[in-house]
Every structure is written in structure tokens, then in C-alpha cells.
UniProtKB/Swiss-Prot annotation:
EC number in record: 7.1.1.-
Role played: NDH shuttles electrons from NAD(P)H:plastoquinone, via FMN and iron-sulfur (Fe-S) centers, to quinones in the photosynthetic chain and possibly in a chloroplast respiratory chain. The immediate electron acceptor for the enzyme in this species is believed to be plastoquinone. Couples the redox reaction to proton translocation, and thus conserves the redox energy in a proton gradient.
Organism ancestry: Eukaryota, Viridiplantae, Streptophyta, Embryophyta, Tracheophyta
Organism whose genome encodes this protein: Fagopyrum esculentum subsp. ancestrale
Matching InterPro entries: NAD(P)H_OxRDtase_bac/plastid, NADH_UbQ/plastoQ_OxRdtase_su3, NDAH_ubi_oxred_su3_sf
Sequence similarity: Belongs to the complex I subunit 3 family.
Name of protein: NAD(P)H-quinone oxidoreductase subunit 3, chloroplastic
Membrane topology: Multi-pass membrane protein
PANTHER family reported for this sequence: NADH-UBIQUINONE OXIDOREDUCTASE CHAIN 3 (PTHR11058:SF9)
GO biological process: photosynthesis, light reaction
One Pfam family this sequence matches: Oxidored_q4
Molecular function per GO: NADH dehydrogenase (ubiquinone) activity; quinone binding
């Protein structure tokens, strides 16, 4: 039989972690002064007055490099729990993780061949 009371702490944590940001957002909207001064609308660059145009275009290679990084960073998030419980899960989960890693290696080779990892 599935017992829901075992998850009471989870639901309480989920509720509290959802309510706190919503309350903070609402309170900041209520308490913050609403002014449209030119100083408020100007861009802020680490305490230095902005020189020139603040909007710059980034080259697509930075985007591709960041995208490849995010993909392999998420891979680590998925593989860590598997590695921690490897001895309990058995051979079938090992084969599934191996297929997952092989798919990611194929993606890495594809990104490498397309030049997503090159800076020049």
C-alpha cells in the first residue's frame, strides 16, 4: 500500500520553498518606490559609468560553447546518483547508463566536428 504520510516533510518543504520567493516578490513590489528617473533607467556596469553602448552582440561560438557545457554539466547531474547507488541497481541499469554515456559521446563528437569547441 502506498502511504502518503511518508512524504509530509517533502510537501512541507515544497510549500515553504514556493511561498518564500512569492512573498519576497510581492513585498518588493509593494514596498519599492516606483520612479522612472533617467539614473534608474541607465545601465550599471560594476560601479563604473558606462561608456558607449551597453548592448553588445556576442558571437555565436560563445553560445555554442556554453550550450555544450550545459549539456555535459547536466550529464554529470544524471550520472552522480547512478554512481552512488551502482552496487544496488544491478547490470540492467549499468547498460542503460552506458547507452546514455555513448549517446553523449556521439553528441560530443558531433559538436567537435562542427567546430563548437574551437575558439579561433
Amino acid at each position: 500500500m502506498f502511504l502518503l504520510y511518508e512524504y509530509d516533510i517533502f510537501w512541507a518543504f515544497l510549500l515553504i520553498s514556493s511561498v518564500i520567493p512569492i512573498l519576497a516578490f510581492l513585498l518588493s513590489g509593494i514596498l519599492a518606490p516606483i520612479r522612472k528617473d533617467p539614473e534608474k533607467l541607465s545601465s550599471y556596469e560594476s560601479g563604473i559609468e558606462p561608456i558607449g553602448d551597453a548592448w553588445l552582440q556576442f558571437r555565436i561560438r560563445y553560445y555554442m560553447f556554453a550550450l555544450v557545457f550545459v549539456v555535459f554539466d547536466v550529464e554529470t547531474v544524471f550520472l552522480y546518483p547512478w554512481a552512488m547507488s551502482f552496487d544496488v541497481l544491478g547490470v540492467s541499469v549499468f547498460i542503460e547508463a552506458l547507452i546514455f554515456v555513448l549517446i553523449l559521446i556521439v553528441g560530443l563528437v558531433y559538436a567537435w566536428r562542427k567546430g563548437a569547441l574551437e575558439w579561433s
